[in-house]
């Protein structure tokens, strides 16, 4: 006899807030700092449990490189105060990466991305031709208690039509 314990449900309303500060002075690196607070005051689903408030911080640079359209390099630290208390592994909460937009000349645009998410590599690309954009992303999701324990590889392929 198997009993299903996943039948508990609940309702809650979440509120998030965030700030981005961009360095206003003329700078070759064009740095930015970010802060987000998610699930302000926690999300309480009564018997179904709660999702705690989290604070995230990030920093990025967007240097000018003459041979490319743009380059963005960023670093985020998720759940600064470890409110989820799932583990003490800082590597699972550190995310960093870069996006290189090779060109954006109508009707073609090409961007490449690479980084690290939960201590595993990520890759991605966007190709736009006229009004159609094809996007690919590959990343690994951590489901274990510490970085590297139990990983699931995921791939996404999307096709968008827009103008």
Roles of regions detected by a PLM:
Residues 1-163:
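Outer-membrane beta-barrel porins/channels
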């Amino acid at each position: 006899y198997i009993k299903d314990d996943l039948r508990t449900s609940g309702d809650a309303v979440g509120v998030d807030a965030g700030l981005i500060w961009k360095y206003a002075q003329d700078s070759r690196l064009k740095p930015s700092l970010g802060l987000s607070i998610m699930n302000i005051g926690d999300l309480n689903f009564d018997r179904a449990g709660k999702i705690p408030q989290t604070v995230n911080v990030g920093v990025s640079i967007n240097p000018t490189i003459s041979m490319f359209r743009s380059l963005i390099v960023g670093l985020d630290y998720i759940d600064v105060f470890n409110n989820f208390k799932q583990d003490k592994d800082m590597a699972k909460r550190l995310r960093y990466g870069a996006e290189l937009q090779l060109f954006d000349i109508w009707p073609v645009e090409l961007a490449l991305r690479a980084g690290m998410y939960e201590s595993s590599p990520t890759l991605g690309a966007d190709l736009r031709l006229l009004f159609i954009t094809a996007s690919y992303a590959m990343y690994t999701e951590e489901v274990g208690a510490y970085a590297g324990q139990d990983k699931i590889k995921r791939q996404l392929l999307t096709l968008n039509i827009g103008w």
